[in-house]
Amino acid sequence: MHWAKCFEGIVSSCTLGLFLVAAAQTAEGQTEPVKPKAKTAKQSTMRPSSKASSAAMPNEEDWWKNAVIYEIYPRSFQDTNGDGVGDLNGITDRLDYLKDLGIDAIWLTPVYPSPDVDFGYDISDYKNIDPQYGTLADFDRLVAEANKRHIRILMDMVMNHTSDKHEWFTQSRSSRDNPYRDWYVWHDGKGQTATDKGVPPNNWQSFFGHSAWEWDEKTRQYYYHKFYVQQPDVNWDNPHIHEAFKDIVRFWLKRGVGGFRFDAITTLFEDPSMADEGVVKDKDGNPIINAYGDPTLDSSKTDNQPGLHAVVQEMRETADAFNSPKFPGTRVLIGETYLPNIQELLKMYGSPDKPEFHLPMDTQVGFINKLDVTAFRSKLIDVQTEIGHNIPLLLFDNHDNPRLDMRYGDGVHDTDIQRVLSTVLFASRGTALFYYGDEIGMKTTPPTRKEDVKDPIGVIGWPKEKGRDGERTPMQWDTSANAGFTTGKPWLPVPPSAATINVEAAKADPKSLFRWYQSLIRLKKTNPAFANGANLMLDTENTKVLSWMRQAPGAAEVVVAVNFTADPQIVNLAARGAGMQAAHLTTLLKTPGGPVPRSMESIKLGPYGVYIGELR
């Protein structure tokens, strides 16, 4: 799903370790595990305010509550057969790398058979593997090998639409009286007659430009497609669709998947009135024109409609009912939820008697797209305090958006800025989701010529919209040909930055971003305050430094301070709560080369510097 378009519409553990391991930093800046010092008798008496929230200590059933999830775009991760396209065996071959990084689960973007109009999100068969990625046997091997390493495989589930090559749609468009006709959304045109097709039923638009209605000459009706013409929307008012997708979910659960990420979930239903959507206007009252030359619509009739929550409840019930001793643990449901506020996000969790998503994506924090302390603090407070006992799912990046360097970087301090963002991601309460290559600082590399564009969004919208190829380039493993991704011609060019930005170089450098990710993930899993602690914002008037505390009953408190600027900063957190004045700090992690503070009264941070310390 195209995130930029979605936001445009909105605006108009694995089991915890048996012993605590803290991350300490050597004089050279390398992070390495050490056993913690014995706790002192005196601990801070500060406790969470009414605005602090907490989570239960994760166990095998609750693995997802403090998990680290890694998104893989399979065609760009690792190719093993030389055809230039990544495959399932390539992911299996790299599982030890992912285990070393510290992740708990892999989210795979679609690997089902597909004509690839939208690179897998146009599915023609939900119960098989596309030959370019491998076979069902290859998939089973991936699940089994991942399971040995305590890594779960999460599938992408696309229920809003299918490919127009899917057998359901082939039947549906064959005649008006076919049993599958009502499996999709068909409608007569305005002013349609026996000889004139009229015009589309209303002004609804595709996410990818122009009308969302396509005329079918054979059956003389329009069908609805929220995405590409080749991705007709299924009709969720038809009970057969409900049963068909529950059957698909069970098929993959039986193969051992750990859960699903539900794509474009808020667009399942449309307003039955078929009324036009409102046009979004600027301050002068003029329509805002989007990248495709169309007036921007408010999505009021095609997004987050009644009926959505009942469907999610059905899918949750289906997943919860499945239990296999071969693959124990909760099957987690993640929602791709573009919602305008925290109140709507809260609804996507459901209720105790009617649960919905375990982890609806919070897209408010990670897509601010500028280093604004006040905005980050406000959004983090919302997601940490306004969703009750539920677990936040934070993310900053994915396959539909430019990478972090383009959205947040300044071209000079990009690595330090990515340390800042990863600290917010991993040091906040909840589950963290990040995109392949973020851990080594891969850069957005968009095409410079239209003829090089692969993504249809770029083909349609060029030059204003260059598409998503820039964030989907091959994983950069080493300095060999094609960065170790393939022995053939890669489906997208390997960026020149691979000469210096690659896994091999990152693992050899104790100060690398990769080592920073490793250390943060280790802290998230093994430090009780990080694994089980509430979030409490500190120094809330500061517009340069974002600071917060993690607190868990019976555990030493941890403070985090992050400089959002290119200028050195000094923060005094000692006056922010009772008992903190006398606290001493034990450094858990800091930016390489950064100073070591002795107390809460003077924490010095370099440009985009980070400090994490435990109160003693």
Protein language model features and the residues they cover:
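Signal peptide processing junction and immediate N-terminal pro/mature segment
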Residues: 21-37
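C-terminal beta-strand-rich structural cap/linker in extracellular carbohydrate-active enzymes
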Residues: 597-616
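Bacterial N-terminal signal peptides
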Residues: 11-22
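Solvent-exposed beta-hairpin/edge-strand motifs
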Residues: 575-592
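Acidic/aromatic-lined carbohydrate-recognition and catalytic surfaces
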Residues: 32-51, 55-250, 254, 267-340, ...
